[in-house]
UniProtKB/Swiss-Prot annotation:
Induction: Expression is controlled by homeobox transcription factors. At larval stages, induced by starvation, and mildly by hypoxia in midgut but not fat body. Residues 73-103 are annotated as: Disordered. This is Protein charybde. Inhibits cell growth by regulating the Tor pathway upstream of the Tsc1-Tsc2 complex and downstream of Akt1. Acts as a cell death activator during head development. One of its GO terms (biological process) is apoptotic process. The gene is chrb. InterPro entries: RTP801-like, RTP801-like_C_sf. Gene3D superfamilies: RTP801-like. Keywords: Apoptosis, Cytoplasm, Developmental protein. Belongs to the DDIT4 family. The lineage of its organism: Eukaryota, Metazoa, Ecdysozoa, Arthropoda, Hexapoda. GO terms for cellular component: cytoplasm.
Length: 299
């Protein structure tokens, strides 16, 4: 009961300013410490309002833009702050350090992104970060792979410019023999006024003959060549044959099949008009077939 009376008296004394009870005295030291702490907090808040520095670009804090740039470049900053001056805190007593990106394998992420720590401004770090990104991208140049449309000159079978592995003089000599045999075949076996050949056809045929004769003891000199003409599908006519070297015994044969090219406009002209105008021309296709037949046993 005594404690309850004291509590009521204390309440009355605090309300009306009366202090007649001497056996209970409140300590004023805790109140003074609380007032000092409150004043210190308010002072720091007021001082902080004057020195608050937040960089905003296009309505977003620089830290948000920095994070988005890291996401766009597939790099993430590490959580450990960089050590400057023996790992001490930043100038001004701050204990928060700037983060540096992790080491990555991409050319952009492999650059050095260490920003200057003087001042501790987010704008300075942002500027240094973007400068390092642009410089590392410009320094590392990777050539683009070749386009699949850029095909090589040797891709087509028997191309005219695919003659590096054969003798040019042998190709020229054998090509002249082929042209002479085709002129004679036109006069004797082909009912036409002229025969047109692709410009590089005889050179390609000669090169293929030489390649197919490489494993033979005497090369192309021991070859007998048969020339056949296919005017229609499954309609083949032999128009010429000759020995490449008459003084060498033939030990293998090659069968050359030429085809008529019907992709030109002259194939659309009726045959009786060709006979009236005497303009019957046979166009030889650039495609040909070369078949080898050995006359001896390899065993």
């Amino acid at each position: 009961m005594k404690m309850e009376v004291l509590s009521v008296q204390n309440h009355i004394q605090g309300k009306f300013g009366v202090n007649k009870i001497k056996d209970w005295q409140a300590s004023t030291a805790p109140l003074e410490e609380e007032e000092e702490l409150t004043a210190g907090v308010n002072g720091n808040t007021a001082a902080g309002e004057g020195i608050l520095d937040v960089d905003v670009v296009d309505g977003h804090p620089a830290s948000v833009l920095h994070m988005r740039q890291h996401q766009a470049l597939n790099t993430r900053p590490s959580a450990t702050p960089p050590s400057a001056g023996g790992g001490g805190p930043l100038a001004g007593g701050g204990s928060v350090g700037m983060t540096t990106p992790k080491q990555a394998t991409s050319p952009v992420a492999a650059a050095s992104f260490e920003a200057p720590l003087s001042g501790g401004s987010a704008a300075a770090y942002h500027h240094a970060y973007m400068t390092n990104v642009l410089s590392s991208t410009a320094q590392q140049h990777h050539p683009l792979p070749a386009s699949p449309l850029q095909s090589t000159a040797c891709a087509r079978f028997g191309a005219a410019d695919n003659l590096d592995d054969v003798s040019a003089s042998a190709v020229r000599e054998l090509s002249q023999q082929l042209q002479a045999q085709l002129r004679d075949a036109k006069r004797r076996h082909l009912a036409c006024t002229e025969v047109t050949l692709p410009n590089d056809l005889t050179q390609r045929i000669a090169a293929e003959i030489i390649r197919m004769s490489e494993r033979e003891p005497c090369g192309e000199r021991a070859c007998t060549l048969f020339i056949e003409f296919e005017s229609e599908p499954n309609k083949v006519k032999r128009i010429a044959y000759f020995k490449v070297d008459p003084d060498t015994v033939s030990i293998f044969e090659l069968y050359l099949t030429l085809r008529q090219d019907k992709s030109g406009w002259s194939s659309l002209v009726p045959q009786f008009i060709k006979n009236l105008t005497r303009s019957n021309t046979i166009n030889i296709s650039p495609d040909f077939t070369l078949t080898k037949k050995k006359l001896y046993s390899s065993e």
